[in-house]
Amino acid sequence: MKSKLWKLAGILFGVLALSAMAHAGWIDPDAAMAIGVIGNMTNAQARVVDPILSTVAQGYKNGRMVADFLFPVVPVDQRGGKILEFGKEDFLLYNTARAPGADTKEVQFGHLGAAYALEGHRLMGKVPFEHLQEANQVPGINLGRGAVTKTQNIILLASEHQAATIARNAANYAASNKTALAGTSRWDDYVSGISDPVADIDAAVEAIRAQVGMRPNTVVLSPKAFKAAKRHPKIIDRVKYTSRDSLTLEMLADLFDVERVVSGDAIYNNAGTMTDVWGKDVVVAYTEVATADDGGVPSFGYTYRLRGNPMVEMAYQDRNAKSWIYPVTDERVPVIAAAAAGYLIQTAVS
């Protein structure tokens, strides 16, 4: 018994001595120390972190991203199925009167349209052992959270770009639900007196209302369109008596008479050129943002996402790269459910 105690004491003394010498700068921690001391998270510990980091990924929001305003998330349990699409009948007022003995009218909300298939998006965040050494801590919530949020930000950018590509595709709209501004009609023409952002939004609102019986509640502006709008003489003239020094998105929402106006400020690297995800366009739509658990509510679009995603898988050590790896998976796809509830204004600015 005494010999075992002496052995344990010797091992403990050796570890403390090595640690003290490393902190004092007498020796450099080698790979074994990085893996055995700083990088020593057991599988049980990793399993504890996984649900926490999955919650981080699921709750993470980037203020530059606005896709969810046009394509609110609907959790699904299958990776494929039919899009629940909506026609004009889903938005119109019904005569609910019933005569004695008459049959009760039936209403079916939505119909199964084109097939959808969730797309799997997966990216792995890396935390090098060297960073852990410098931070003098084991890999856990803090560095893991940083790796997950940065990885999730990249996945969100890809999702934003995909949604913007769909929303900005003129082929997805009927002729009555799109326009392309040109020349003096563009919002950044302040001289001719012809361009009029408010009139353009009013026309979009009326086009949607006339078809689906509901006023659109969302306007997504590209950053260039937002910049042009808040500097436009006709808009400034309408708000010049307010106490604000500069025009805000909330003020534009009041002016356009919609619930929300958002600016899609995300950019991406396009062959070395930083490019606006939302280009020069404007999208007006009726969307039901509060439909996360109900896919049966009419809306311009949805993002079908596998329930429980995004998901952070069990962290593991890559000893060759001397790093902890945090895989993040997100299975989802944005779809248009009611094209008549959207309106596209292309090339709102030059």
Where are the predicted features?
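N-terminal secretory/membrane targeting signals
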Residues: M1-I27
